[in-house]
Swiss-Prot record:
Protein name: 4-hydroxy-tetrahydrodipicolinate reductase 1
EC number: 1.17.1.8
Family: Belongs to the DapB family.
Lineage: Bacteria, Pseudomonadati, Pseudomonadota, Alphaproteobacteria, Hyphomicrobiales
Main location: cytoplasm
Gene designation: dapB1
């Protein structure tokens, strides 16, 4: 692959499962190349070649623990880490005036506010899911929620992930919940039901329910159920390989290159806004 004009990308969390998947994805997509790899200061993988660790051979990019030097020479950063880390990296991306693609989930309102503040100087693409299929599903969910009256159809969102996932509901489930709420013309906050236990009483009209399953090695299953009297519609997406998220993240970075600073979503990237 020619390096002339390629977008130089840094992968943070480079030794993790998603980090290695991102490195492999960048290696296969024209127009992008890995120029930096960052890990925690206590990572046993510091100093190793990022490409060799990801199984694509030596690419002469050692894994380091200081993001500042590599951000300074990069065009963008791909980030599927933790909320606290993503907030920190957003600040560094703002200093470097580069693209920051965030696939991290579990961010709090304060985390999101700090990321939005960084977007005054960085071009940030943030999404709970980077795949084309899920973002198209979100559009369909919004349309269905708009077309089907809340008095007639209840909305429930069911998701399942592998046993190692630490946040719930998933970022994708919340993305779909936001889409359903937008279709209904309401805010998700205050209308979401995330747990049911004991005597819960009857279902509140217009609420949006979430159910979470964890187990095995499931990459990600999501279903949005619109349940009416005598009929039920289910809109679903099943992720079979986390590489779909990595490819979407690289596509987002390439799309964001040259865009004005701001906070964008995958709907913007895919032209679904």
């Amino acid at each position: 692959m020619s390096e002339a004009g390629d977008m130089g990308l840094v992968v943070v969390g480079a030794a993790g499962r998603m980090g290695q998947t991102l490195i492999r994805a960048i290696h296969t997509i024209p127009g992008a190349r890995v120029i930096g790899a960052v890990e925690r200061a206590d990572s046993p993988h510091l100093g190793k070649d990022a490409g060799e660790l990801a199984g694509i051979g030596i690419i002469n990019v050692p894994i380091g623990d200081d993001p500042l030097p590599v951000f300074a020479k990069a065009d963008g950063v791909l980030d599927f880490t933790t909320p606290a880390s993503s907030v920190e990296f957003a600040g560094y991306a703002a200093q470097a005036r580069i693209v920051h693609v965030i696939g991290t989930t579990g961010c709090s309102a304060d985390d999101n506010a700090r990321i939005a503040a960084a977007a005054r100087h960085a071009t940030i693409v943030k999404s709970g899911n980077m795949s084309l299929g899920v973002n198209l599903l979100a559009v369909l969910v919004e349309q269905a929620a708009r077309a089907l009256d809340a008095d007639d159809f209840d909305i429930e969102i069911l998701e399942m992930h592998h046993k190692h996932k630490v946040d719930a509901p998933s970022g994708t489930a919340l993305l779909l919940g936001e889409a359903a709420a937008a279709g209904r013309g309401i805010a998700l906050a205050g209308n979401d039901v995330r747990s049911r236990d004991g005597h819960t009483g009857v279902r509140k009209t217009g609420s949006i329910g979430f159910a979470t399953l964890r187990g095995g090695s499931v990459v990600g299953d999501h279903s949005v159920i619109l349940a009416g009297t005598g009929e039920r519609i289910t809109l679903s997406h099943h992720a079979e390989d986390r590489a779909i998220f990595a490819r979407g993240a690289v596509k987002a970075a390439l799309w964001a290159r040259g865009k004005k600073p701001g906070l964008y979503s995958m709907r913007d990237v895919l032209g679904l806004s």
